[in-house]
Amino acid sequence: MNLIPSAPPMADYLRLRADSGLSPRTAAQAEGALANSWRWCHAMVDGEVVAMGRILGDGGWYFHIADMATLPAFQGRGIGRAILEWLLAEIRTHAPEDPYITLMADEPGRPLYRRLGFVETAPRSLGMWLPG
């Protein structure tokens, strides 16, 4: 496995989202995501993009982990963990002191996030979204 500190190609981004169970996105949505994230990391195995993750953030204090996705055939091999550890190291290296790091955790990813120190915010706060 090789970690690549950049965004995956658009076709791979769209495929990873769909094949890993994340909601599908359009090419126009992918274009914005690929161009405007604070940091990206993707993993390749035998020339295939098999996992990815990115950070949204202001570079000051707020950072949000997004698009953590691993193809089902490659889950359970530590690839997602390696990507998340790389992303967190980028924040710790380049952000000012005491960054605020968030993510939205679907059920399959929660054990990984807990192992790396993330805690649920409920009942103090709950994630919300605006359907649209």
Task: Label each PLM-derived region with a short phrase.
Residues 1-28:
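Short amphipathic alpha-helix that is part of the acyltransferase structural core
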Residues 32-42, 97-99:
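A short helix-loop-beta-strand connector motif used in the catalytic cores of GNAT acetyltransferases and
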Residues 42, 48-57, 61-64, 69:
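Conserved beta-strand in the GNAT
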Residues 57-65, 75, 97, 123:
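A conserved beta-turn-beta hairpin within the catalytic core of GNAT-like acetyltransferases
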Residues 74, 78-86:
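Conserved acetyl-CoA pyrophosphate-binding loop and the N-cap/start of the following alpha-helix
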Residues 91-105:
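Conserved GNAT acetyl-CoA-binding A-motif
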Residues 114-124:
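Conserved acetyl-CoA-binding loop of GNAT-fold acetyltransferases
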